């Protein structure tokens, strides 16, 4: 039986954490957030000695650890953490569309080539100024036959694989073609074969 001064039952556990009150079904809603059911202001009771809780539809709820969650939000989990929707995860390299390569241009800790044989990190912008080269342009300059100054692709004659490789086989047919990353494309163009 509840003590005299404790009319709502115990509000915390033995460690001082708030206890999750009953009065909801706990079912997962349409977008992964807990939804409350019942009429606004309905009192739900389970006997005389049980905790009586007033359920208000649309009120902010807390999870089982007392962390407030967002009711009706997309992707909230049992800890009240809001997830993101529509994301596909991260990939292991490359530059996102619209991003700059400022972090990659410095060369951070790799081998650095000294002398005049290295390529410049900027080029003429055609209007009397300079513009920073992207990583794509730098790689093109380093590849055999690179550094043409134009960004147009030249078609490879049928039957020639370019750089001594043969094209053909089931792996390169259009119906079984896999999307290749930028690193795979660079590795294919480097002399020395497929690593």
UniProtKB/Swiss-Prot annotation:
What is this protein's tissue specificity according to the annotation?
A: Expressed in roots and leaves.
Main localisation: cytoplasm
Q: Which Pfam families match?
A: Dehydrin (PF00257)
Where, subcellularly, is it found? Cytoplasm; Nucleus
Could you tell me what induces this protein?
Leaves exhibit a diurnal pattern of expression with up-regulation in the morning, followed by a midday maximum and a 2.5 fold down-regulation in the evening. Expression in leaves is unaffected by salinity or dehydration stress but is induced by mannitol. Mannitol application, salinity and dehydration stress rapidly induce expression in roots.
Key words of the record: Cytoplasm, Nucleus, Phosphoprotein, Stress response
Polar residues bias: start-end ranges: 50-64
**InterPro entries reported for this sequence:** Dehydrin, Dehydrin_CS
Q: State the name under which the record lists this protein.
A: Dehydrin DHN1
The UniProt annotation puts the region (Disordered) at 1-195
Q: State the encoding gene.
A: DHN1
Per UniProt, the ranges with Low complexity bias are 37-48, 65-88
The UniProt entry's GO CC annotations, sorted and at most eight, read: cytoplasm; cytosol; nucleus
């Amino acid at each position: 039986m509840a003590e005299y001064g404790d009319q709502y039952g115990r509000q915390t556990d033995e460690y001082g954490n708030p206890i999750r009150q009953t009065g909801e079904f706990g079912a997962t809603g349409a977008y992964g957030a807990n939804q409350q059911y019942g009429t606004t202001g309905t009192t739900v009771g389970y006997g005389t000695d049980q905790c009586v809780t007033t359920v208000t539809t649309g009120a902010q709820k807390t999870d089982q650890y007392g962390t407030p969650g967002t009711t009706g939000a997309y992707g909230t989990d049992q800890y009240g953490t809001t997830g993101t929707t529509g994301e596909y995860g991260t990939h292991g390299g490359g530059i996102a569309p619209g991003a700059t390569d400022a972090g990659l241009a410095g060369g951070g800790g790799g081998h650095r080539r000294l002398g005049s044989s290295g390529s410049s990190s900027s080029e003429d912008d055609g209007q009397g100024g300079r513009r920073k080269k992207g990583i794509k342009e730098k790689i093109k300059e380093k590849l055999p036959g690179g550094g043409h100054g134009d960004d147009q692709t030249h078609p490879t004659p049928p039957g020639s694989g370019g750089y001594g490789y043969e094209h053909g086989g089931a792996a390169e047919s259009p119906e079984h073609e896999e999307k290749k990353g930028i690193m795979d494309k660079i590795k294919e163009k480097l002399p020395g074969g497929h690593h």
